[in-house]
Every structure is written in C-alpha cells, then in structure tokens.
Amino acid sequence: MNAEVPAEGSIPFAGVADLAILKGAELTNVSVWKYGVTLSFNDEPLTITVENNAEFQSQGRTEIFNQEIIIGFGARMLSLVGRCVSDMQATEDKAIVLSFDDGSKLALRPDDSGYESYTVNLPNGSIFVG
C-alpha cells in the first residue's frame, strides 16, 4: 500500500494507487442520510461516502447530484447493489470514475470550495479524500 505514514494517533491517507482495491469489488450496501450517501463494497470496511459532486451515467443518461439533492443519488445507486466494479480510474487531481458491470458509471470529483466531496475508507484503515 502507498498510504502515507501518519503521526501517532492520526488516520493514514491513501494514495491513488491504493484505490485499485475497488476494481472487482461488489456493491453490497447503500446507506442514505440527509447530507450524504455511503456505498459499501464486499461486505467489508471498504466504503465511499459521497456528500457532493456525484455524476451517475446509465442507459445513455447522465445525472449530476450536488449536496441539495444527494438523496436522489442514493436512490440511483440502489439499482447497482449486487453489481461489481469492472473498471476504476483515478487521477492525481482526485477525480474517480467507477464503471460497473452493467455499463453504469459513477464519477466523483472534489469541489472547488475546499470541502471534501467524497471519502474512500479502505480496509487497512487509511482514507482517500476528494
């Protein structure tokens, strides 16, 4: 793993290469609350929490979800429970695109406000923030 060495008691940060663990992962749970959506994979501590800037593509349609309508994003993601990530792309500017085995795509990007749009929690305890 490429996780940075943290100060004592702090959470280690993951690098882009660490996100490869998502390729082949099965979406096993979608949790929705007022300000975000958590996607859980492989029934293990591998999650993506999304609070803003989610783009969902399916059957030729693209929908963009900001924080005001993030609950709608959660509803869309329910259709992918049981589906696997067939491809994952991540860039150094922290944009992530997950392609699912049914052809759907999820794109996550950091926003310009300085607040996090999403967080990936990896089984080793490290996090990737975008």
Where are these regions (language model features)?
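Surface-exposed, interaction-prone regions used to assemble/regulate multi-protein complexes
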Residues: 1-130
